[in-house]
Amino acid sequence: AMASVAAFSERAISGEFGEAMQGKFLANQNYGIVPIISALAWGLGYFGMPHILIRFMGIRSNKEVALSRRIATVWVVIAFIGTLIVGSLGTVYLPEILSPSAAETVFSATIQKMFPAFIGGIFLCAILAAAMSTADSQLLVASSAFSQDIFKGLIKKDATTKEVLSISRIAVFIIAAVAFVLSLDENSSIFGLVSYAWAGFGATFGPLVLLALFWKGATAKGAIAGLIGGGVTVVAWHNIPATVAPIFGVYEILPAFIVCLVLAVVVSLLDKNKDPEMIAEFEAFKKMED
């Protein structure tokens, strides 16, 4: 491991990596406005991550929100810097894996090349742990939403705790099975699936979260309209090729986010049945901030 790290350091100090990276970036200067907008639009997805938001909802005290926010932001910055470093250096250190399908294994390939099996296994376990942490959080959020909000909230309001638990377990099984089937598609990549899911989360939930936090005029009907409109736009935009029109090359999260936001606002303004209890709760939280 030390020999690999030493060799890696020598190549970095010699300027080899810098020259190689410069050559790769200069060879890809044909980026237009569409790829740039699409890259920036990825940030919209953070507003609609239910498995992250639920952590803040379950916080012990509202006094800890500010600290938690800072910790989360710092951690994301550190993680993304590490990701960029590994990906950038991997394109030079491991040029043989630059095919679109193999490029997703750059982290594991770099570890296998630089560290012995024992240490490499520990690092690879960290990747698996991160994936499992995200997966189980999303499964729990999805199953609880279906069992509590849909089954008990709409289908059977007098459902017992045992019935809700059974529905929750069934939902976990079905969602996991669907995810497994999607993973069997040999023509799809991890990045492609994550990108699609990221757009779905961000465009359907993101605008609603922002409206719920900053606008007391938002209503349930507006939220439902925005949710449906954003979701349909994501699916439709994703399946329309850019050859139809250049604008369809824009990452689907951006148009879907706008559609969801506009529909939620318009329908809420048209909805005369405002919930006085929700407005009072909004005002109470606003006074707490002041």
Where are these regions (language model features)?
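Membrane-embedded helix-loop-helix hairpins and adjacent transmembrane boundary segments
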Residues: 1-290
